[in-house]
From Swiss-Prot:
It comes from the Eukaryota. The lineage of its organism: Eukaryota, Viridiplantae, Streptophyta, Embryophyta, Tracheophyta. This is Transcription factor bHLH157. InterPro entries: bHLH_dom (IPR011598), LHW-like (IPR043561), MYC/MYB_N (IPR025610). Keywords: Developmental protein, DNA-binding, Nucleus, Transcription, Transcription regulation. Transcription factor that may regulate root development. The keyword Membrane does not apply. A motif (Nuclear localization signal) lies at residues 341-348. Homodimer.
Length: 527
């Protein structure tokens, strides 16, 4: 945004002959203060703009503050300076001493309000007459930039694109079924090319009659029964089983790809027993007599499966059989083919079925440790309970830096400090007092440690302590210590601050005087 403001200010200066342009914007912390946002200037006005950087006009005070408060622009010329002389004298403590020096060579100064965005100040070494075109162009350019949305979608474009969409009636999709949408053009088959041609007619007939045994099995089994089929079985006497289907067999239904004979599967279980039986006997006699305990298949379903004819061993080609057998069948299982199958080491153990949403696999140790550390951080960092992990880490870094600064400044505050000002009767004042009985309401002192200042100010009410703190923070000062003290029936705000090298004691005093005058006028109006 800074480059956009500078580009607009530059175009205003070049198009209308202004020597400099300064954009004053409302401070986000204290809306009563205007802060320096961006500027453009020529070589002659470099010093003027540099002096404006550290100024902070207050709303309703001074020319810039009055323009921001009233919303009416001001157009000043050097030949009418005598009309404003008294006001400039009053504005000396308000931070506008720079305007007096401007008129030594500046002919025109224009201060234009921008509504809620702020104020723009223009100056020129030439006499530029007031123009409605300049006012409208300046206001429109800067307000559009301030109110421009960032990273927001264009809703009009979105609705236009939605309006171009064509709506299709639901009847046009009635010809599609679930299997038609997700079926492959050429699904893999376990049958050899010779058997595909010979079985095409019978397969089509079975498809017409609806005798798809693979889907009969899935429809007759419940979800719990399917889990039991996939789990390791107890003592059973299983023989081989192959179910005749139309281009689908039990392995296709369960997602096993016959084109990958080296697929690694669990060495023990129902399907390994079935495959070992079919490989050893070279026959595929269909039988579900010993598997019926796993499911609630009714008598008609079992009868249909029992009467289904078996194919020869060509269902599993010989070259694929050797590879598959070595991977799927262990030595101890080969010896148990055709007999009673038992598990010696897991005979009396029953597996518990996993509940919905739970996983049997244990969480990795490193992931568990990370989750534990994040939980501890959320309890330690303020406002870290409901934020994301990225925000939590950012808050953690800021909190650590803050705690480190507390330890650093705590040691410094324990050390005795002295003011750099000249002591007189054990008291130091930020400005001269005519007589000893007068108490100055504001004191700003520079301490013996570089960059540190002590600020003291009278508070009429306790709520003014927070306002003073906001003004101090608005000047870019870091508050190291802030307390309220009672002295002779008056409440004093006492601050020790860390200032940047470019901030002077006089500038801090100017801002506090403005705040003090604002409260004084407010009290006079109430009284």
């Amino acid at each position: 945004m800074g480059s956009e403001y500078k580009h607009i200010l530059k175009s205003l200066c070049l198009s209308h002959g202004w020597s400099y342009a300064v954009f004053w914007r409302y401070d986000p912390i204290n809306s009563m203060i205007l802060r320096f946002e961006e500027a453009y200037n020529d070589e002659q006005s470099v010093a003027l703009v540099d002096d404006m950087v550290l100024q902070a006009p207050i709303l309703g005070q001074g020319i810039v503050g009055e323009v921001a408060s009233s919303g009416n622009h001001q157009w000043l010329f050097s030949d009418t300076l005598f009309q404003w002389e008294h006001e400039f004298q009053n504005q000396f403590l308000c931070g506008f001493k720079i305007l007096i020096r401007q008129f030594t060579y500046t002919q025109t100064i224009a201060i234009i309000p921008l509504g809620s965005s702020g104020v723009v100040q223009l100056g020129s070494t030439q006499k530029i007459l007031e123009s409605t075109e300049i006012l409208e162009q300046t206001t429109r350019a800067l307000q559009e930039t301030c109110l421009k949305p960032h990273d927001s979608g264009d809703l009009d474009t979105l609705f236009e694109s939605l309006g171009d969409c064509e709506i299709f009636p639901a009847e046009s999709f009635q010809g599609f079924s679930f299997d038609d949408i997700f079926a492959e053009d050429n699904p893999p088959s376990l049958l050899s090319p010779e058997m595909i041609s010979s079985e095409a007619a019978s397969s089509n007939q079975d498809l017409t009659n609806g005798d798809d045994y693979g889907f009969d099995i899935l429809q007759s089994y419940s979800l719990d029964d399917l889990y039991q089929l996939l789990a390791d079985p107890p003592e059973q006497n299983c023989s081989s089983m192959v179910i005749q289907g139309v281009d689908k067999d039990l392995f296709d239904i369960l997602g096993m790809n016959s084109q990958t004979p080296t697929m690694a599967l669990p060495p023990k279980g129902l399907f390994s027993e079935l495959i070992s039986s079919s490989l050893s006997n070279n026959t595929c006699s269909s039988s579900l007599t010993n598997v019926q305990e796993y499911s609630g298949v009714n008598q008609s379903k079992r009868r249909k499966l029992d009467t289904s004819s078996a194919h020869s061993s060509s269902l599993f080609p010989q070259e694929e059989t050797v590879t598959s057998r070595s991977l799927w069948i262990d030595d101890d299982e080969r010896s148990s083919i055709g007999g009673n199958w038992k598990k010696p080491h897991e005979e009396g153990v029953k597996k518990k079925r996993a509940k919905a949403g739970e996983s049997r696999r244990p969480r990795p140790k490193d992931r568990q440790m990370i989750q534990d550390r994040i939980k501890e951080l959320r309890g330690m960092i303020p406002n870290g309970a409901k934020c994301s992990i990225d925000t939590l880490l950012d808050l953690t870094i800021k909190h650590m830096v803050f705690m480190q600064s507390l330890a650093k400044y705590a040691e410094r505050l324990k050390q005795p400090y002295e003011s750099k000002l000249v002591k007189e009767k054990e008291r130091t004042w930020a400005l001269e007092v005519g007589e000893e009985g007068v108490v100055c309401p504001i004191m700003v002192e520079e301490l013996n440690r570089e960059g540190e200042m002590q600020i003291e100010m009278v508070c009429e009410e306790r709520e003014e302590f927070l306002e003073i703190g906001q003004v101090v923070r608005g000047l870019g000062l870091k508050i190291l210590k802030g307390v309220m003290e009672t002295r002779k029936g008056q409440i004093w705000a006492h601050f020790i601050v860390q200032a940047k090298p470019q901030v002077t004691r006089i500038q801090v005093l100017y801002s506090l005087v403005q705040l003090f005058q604002h409260h004084t006028k407010h009290d006079d109006l109430l009284s």
